[in-house]
């Protein structure tokens, strides 16, 4: 049986990455093989591209193309082989992030991102996407108190507002796979909701 593909999305500072370990533990507790990965990255080449994408200045279309180049490698080398052998894949970001960050945040025409999506993975979509949502002001405040920011995390509040709107538009357009999670609550409360969703989500 083919595995399931679960993605976690949300703008920087929304808290999504904090819950990956708990999700993996729940799935492994069912006796499933779980592959935990991330974008950009997930492969040796993808991690090199990640460094460029997070820290180097570049044209917005170059950024978009590099994101999808890393994604193509990630799908071919990690995601598809894992799903084919029956493993469940849990990824910190996938293509929804390109619609939010490159289309929404950077202003790349959405039809270009749609064309890349159709070319790079025409038959692959997440089975479940957990979208962690917080007000822009909370995101910015969390980032200011955290580690040294990358180039995305140094962007303006308006940039993050466009990202948030991009994510919410994706969730509204594809409600069958999205679960919207209020990340502006205590960590334990958010984790309980995440784990409840995962326990209800079956193959």
From Swiss-Prot:
Enzyme class label: transferase
EC numbers for this chain: 2.7.4.9
Residues that, per the record, bind ATP: 10-17
Reactions mediated catalytically: dTMP + ATP = dTDP + ADP
CDD domains to which the protein is assigned, alphabetical: TMPK (cd01672)
Pfam families: Thymidylate_kin
A GO MF term: dTMP kinase activity
Claim: Membrane is one of the keywords in the record: no
Record key words, sorted: ATP-binding, Kinase, Nucleotide biosynthesis, Nucleotide-binding, Transferase
GO biological process: dTDP biosynthetic process; dTTP biosynthetic process; dUDP biosynthetic process
Matching Gene3D superfamilies: P-loop containing nucleotide triphosphate hydrolases (3.40.50.300)
Superkingdom, taxonomy of origin: Bacteria
UniProt key word ATP-binding: yes
InterPro entries, A to Z: P-loop_NTPase (IPR027417), Thymidylate_kin-like_dom (IPR039430), Thymidylate_kinase (IPR018094)
GO cellular component: cytosol
PANTHER family named in the record: THYMIDYLATE KINASE (PTHR10344), UMP-CMP KINASE 2, MITOCHONDRIAL (PTHR10344:SF4)
Function: Phosphorylation of dTMP to form dTDP in both de novo and salvage pathways of dTTP synthesis.
Family as reported in the entry's similarity comment: Belongs to the thymidylate kinase family.
NCBIfam families in the record: DTMP_kinase
Listed name of the protein: Thymidylate kinase
Species for this entry: Methylobacillus flagellatus (strain ATCC 51484 / DSM 6875 / VKM B-1610 / KT)
